[in-house]
Structures are given as structure tokens and as C-alpha cells.
């Protein structure tokens, strides 16, 4: 018979603890190896501060672009407004003399010598007599011809004209409510042979010119015969001008809708003549 006796070995607790801790570490590494690591990104992850800086830069860039577009829109609107104002202040008609900023310039009918181009050209010539020396002869003749036609052009006359008779002669009478008394031209007075009825100026009056007034002037307006007086003037047109005093005494009515001068009943109506009718027509 074989007897086996266990050997008595001394107890070593530190070795056991080391073996246990070694086993635990190996088990932990095995568990860590079993866990799959997340896939790594190809680009490095930027820090949080860098991301906020880029967002602020993009925001600032967008705001700057928006402000630039708004400034462009304001500039376009300003230019468009200036263009509209410039177009509004332009001449509606190239011959509108009342829109031309020249001193003492009034609209005086449709005469070509009174239009802006002629007025400016005439003032340039009058202000600088040597201005035409360097111009061709044909241009000088043209400008001098315009000047001569201007000097011989007819005087503008009022628009409201009616026919009447005086001394059995036909006259063109202007209806002028802006004048208190009647007026007659010296040429018309001589043609009618009424110089004897003229009241001479007083001896103390040294003013040159024609006599002042003619009396007992019989004027036939339609069927109405009016005895009136008139002041003598140098102007040749109009030949005779009815003032406000005579118009009120006749109770005249100016009917522009029908183009007639209505006299008090039962007298007839006097039609107005065409505008700016030349003498003798």
C-alpha cells in the first residue's frame, strides 16, 4: 500500500492576489478588444470655438451683401427720381416762350420772331456785334434777314376782334376789357378824315405825339350806332379798341363758347374774327 501524504507548503496570499489581478486585467483587455471602435472621420474635428467663428463670418458676409444690395437699390431709385424730375422740367414744346427763363420775356402770340431760339440769337448778336465776323457770308445774310423781318413784322393784336363801320368804312374793332377808354390809331383817324374832331393837347403839355382825344365818333356795331370818344394812340394795330366803359354802357356779353359779342336786346350779335388776322383781310 502506498500512502501519499500532502506536503505542507507555506501560505502565500500575495501570489494569489497577483494572479487574480492579472486574470482580471486580461479579462478586461479581452472585453475592450471585443468592442468595435467607431469609424474615424477623414477630416479632423475642429474645435467648438472655430465653428462659431466661421458661422459669425458667414453671417457678417451675408449682412454686408444685403446692405450692398439695399444701397444699390437706393442709388437706382435716386437716379430714377432725378431723371423723372429732369424730364418734368424739360420744355413741353420747343417754342414755349413762357417757359424760357429769360428776363422780361412774355408769351406774345405765335410770331416766329418771338420764339426762344430767335430771342437768344438776337440777344447774342446785340450783345456782341463782332460775333458774325467769322461766320460765312450766307449765315450773315440769313441772320440779318431775320433781324430785318423782325423790325418790319406786324404788332401783335388782341384776339377778340369784331367788324364795325365808321364813316361808311369797315373797321376791325378789338374788344379789350383791360382798357377803360376807347382808343383809335393815328393812321385810322387820318384814313377816316376825322382830324378836325380831335381835341388838341393843352398848351402846357409838351409831350410829343399825336393829339390826345377825338370826340363825337359814330361807330356802328351791327344795328346799333354808338356815339363815343376815343383816345388817339401811335400804334397802328388794332385800328380801334372798345374799352370797358363803352362795353358796360352797351351791356355787352362776351360769349366765348359761341364766339360772339352779344349786345343788349333787341340788337344782333357780332361774331369774333379769326385770331391774329392781318390788316386788310
Swiss-Prot record:
Residues 36-47 have a biased composition (Pro residues). Interacts with NR1F2, RARA and THRB in a ligand-dependent manner. GO terms for molecular function: aspartic-type endopeptidase activity. InterPro entries: NRIP_C, Peptidase_aspartic_DDI1-type, Peptidase_aspartic_dom_sf. Pfam families: Asp_protease. Gene3D superfamilies: Acid Proteases (2.40.70.10). One of its GO terms (biological process) is Notch signaling pathway. It is found in: Nucleus. One of its GO terms (cellular component) is cytoplasm. Its main location: nucleus. A motif (LXXLL motif) lies at residues 244-248. This is Nuclear receptor-interacting protein 2. Coiled coil: none annotated. Keywords: Nucleus, Transcription, Transcription regulation. Down-regulates transcriptional activation by nuclear receptors such as NR1F2. Residues 55-78 have a biased composition (Basic and acidic residues). Disulfide bonds: none annotated.
Amino acid at each position: 500500500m502506498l500512502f501519499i501524504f500532502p506536503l505542507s507548503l507555506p501560505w502565500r496570499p500575495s501570489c494569489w492576489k497577483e494572479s487574480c489581478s492579472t486574470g482580471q486585467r486580461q479579462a478586461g483587455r479581452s472585453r475592450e478588444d471585443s468592442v468595435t471602435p467607431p469609424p474615424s472621420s477623414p477630416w479632423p474635428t475642429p474645435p467648438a470655438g472655430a465653428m462659431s467663428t466661421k458661422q459669425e463670418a458667414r453671417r457678417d458676409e451675408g449682412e454686408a451683401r444685403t446692405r450692398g444690395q439695399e444701397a444699390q437699390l437706393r442709388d437706382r431709385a435716386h437716379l430714377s427720381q432725378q431723371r423723372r424730375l429732369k424730364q418734368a422740367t424739360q420744355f413741353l414744346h420747343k417754342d414755349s416762350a413762357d417757359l424760357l427763363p429769360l428776363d422780361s420775356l412774355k408769351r406774345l402770340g405765335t410770331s416766329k420772331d418771338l420764339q426762344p431760339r430767335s430771342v437768344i440769337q438776337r440777344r447774342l448778336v446785340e450783345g456782341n456785334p463782332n460775333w458774325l465776323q467769322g461766320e460765312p457770308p450766307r449765315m450773315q445774310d440769313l441772320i440779318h434777314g431775320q433781324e430785318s423781318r423782325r423790325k418790319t413784322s406786324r404788332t401783335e393784336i388782341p384776339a377778340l376782334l369784331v367788324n364795325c363801320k365808321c364813316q361808311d368804312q369797315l373797321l376791325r374793332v378789338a374788344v379789350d376789357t383791360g382798357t377803360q377808354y376807347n382808343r383809335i390809331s393815328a393812321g385810322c383817324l387820318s384814313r377816316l378824315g376825322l382830324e378836325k374832331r380831335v381835341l388838341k393837347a393843352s398848351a402846357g403839355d409838351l409831350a410829343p405825339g399825336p393829339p390826345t382825344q377825338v370826340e363825337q365818333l359814330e361807330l356802328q356795331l351791327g344795328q346799333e350806332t354808338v356815339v363815343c370818344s376815343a383816345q388817339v394812340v401811335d400804334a397802328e394795330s388794332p385800328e380801334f379798341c372798345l374799352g370797358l366803359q363803352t362795353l358796360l354802357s352797351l351791356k355787352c356779353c362776351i360769349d366765348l363758347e359761341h364766339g360772339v359779342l352779344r349786345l343788349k336786346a333787341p340788337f344782333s350779335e357780332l361774331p369774333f374774327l379769326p385770331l391774329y388776322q392781318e390788316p386788310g383781310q
